A protein has these predicted regions:
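Conserved, mostly hydrophobic/aromatic
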Residues: 40, 135, 174, 216
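Alpha-helix N-cap and loop-to-helix initiation/capping positions
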Residues: 39, 110-117, 146-157, 184-196
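Glycine-rich, proline-tolerant flexible connector loops at the mouths of alpha/beta enzymes
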Residues: 70-72, 137-148, 181-183
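Alpha/beta catalytic barrel-like cores
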Residues: 1-128, 139-141
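Conserved small/polar residues in nucleotide/adenosyl-binding loops
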Residues: 218-225
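Metal-dependent enolase-superfamily TIM-barrel catalytic cores that perform enediolate-based chemistry
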Residues: 115-132, 139, 148-166
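Non-cysteine beta-strand/loop elements that form the S-adenosyl-L-methionine
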Residues: 93-95, 133-138, 214-215
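Alpha/beta enzyme core
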Residues: 123-128, 161, 167-168, 191-212
Length: 225
C-alpha cells in the first residue's frame, strides 16, 4: 500500500467526512457580518477554532480543507492550525486553486486557474502540515454546455494539478462540480456528469496519476426546475 493510499483511506476511514473550512475571506466576511461580528483575522480564526475543537471532530471528521490564511495561523493556545487538527485524528488539507475564470472562446463557461507557481506553493503547504489538497472545476448544464472545450480544459487542469500534488507527497481531491442550476432533467445531469468524470479519469491516467491516492468529489445527478 502506497503512502498516498494510506492518507486517502485515513481521510475516509470509519465513515468519516471531510470538513470544508476553506471559505475565502469574502465569504467569511458575509457570514460574520450577518450576525454583526467584525470579519477580522482574529475572529475568522476564532470561528474556525470553535469548529476544530468541537467534541464531534474526533468521531466524525477525517480531513479538514483549509484556506491559505488559516493554514498559516496560530491557535490561541500556541499551536499551528494543522497541529490542532492533527491532534483530533483528522488530516489537514488545503485548497490550492485560485478560482474559476471565463474560458477563452467560450465565455459562458469557466476554467479553473492556479497552476502557475503551484509546485512551490505545495512545498510550503507540505511543510506547514498539509497532506491533501483540493481543486474544483466548474461546469454549467444547458442544451449546449458543458462544451467539449470546457470538459477537456478542466480535466487537463485537474490532471496537471494532481500530478504536482502527488509529486509533493500529498493526496489530491479532484472535484469536477457539475452545477445544479438550470432546467435540466436528472437524466441530462447523469449524462453530463458521467462525461465530465470519464474525461477527468482519462486525463488522470494519461498523466500517470496513482489512482489509489486520489479522492473524487462530485455532485450527485439531480433534476432542477
Amino acid at each position: 500500500m502506497s503512502e498516498l493510499n494510506k492518507i486517502a483511506l485515513k481521510i475516509l476511514s470509519n465513515g468519516k467526512g471531510i470538513l470544508a473550512a476553506d471559505e475565502s475571506n469574502g465569504t467569511m466576511t458575509k457570514r460574520l457580518e450577518s450576525v454583526n461580528i467584525q470579519s477580522s483575522p482574529e475572529n475568522r480564526l476564532l470561528f474556525r477554532e470553535t469548529l476544530f475543537e468541537a467534541d464531534s471532530m474526533r468521531d466524525c471528521i477525517g480531513g479538514v480543507i483549509l484556506y491559505d490564511e488559516t493554514i498559516n495561523q496560530i491557535s490561541n493556545d500556541g499551536k499551528t492550525i494543522p497541529s490542532l487538527i492533527s491532534d483530533t485524528g483528522a488530516i489537514p488539507g488545503i485548497k490550492v486553486d485560485t478560482g474559476a475564470k471565463n474560458l477563452a472562446n467560450s465565455s459562458e463557461e469557466k476554467v479553473t486557474e492556479g497552476l502557475d507557481g503551484l509546485r512551490e506553493r505545495l512545498k510550503r503547504y507540505y511543510q506547514l502540515g498539509a497532506r491533501f489538497t483540493k481543486w474544483r472545476g466548474v461546469y454549467n448544464i444547458t442544451e449546449n454546455y458543458p462544451s467539449k472545450l470546457a470538459i477537456n480544459s478542466n480535466a487537463h487542469a485537474l490532471a496537471r494539478y494532481s500530478a504536482l500534488v502527488q509529486e509533493g507527497g500529498m493526496v489530491p481531491i479532484v472535484e469536477p462540480e457539475v452545477l445544479m442550476d438550470g432546467e435540466h432533467s436528472a437524466e441530462d445531469c447523469l449524462i453530463k456528469t458521467s462525461e465530465v468524470i470519464k474525461k477527468c479519469f482519462e486525463e488522470l491516467i494519461i498523466h500517470k496519476i496513482d489512482l489509489s491516492g486520489v479522492c473524487l468529489l462530485y455532485t450527485s445527478p439531480s433534476p432542477r426546475d
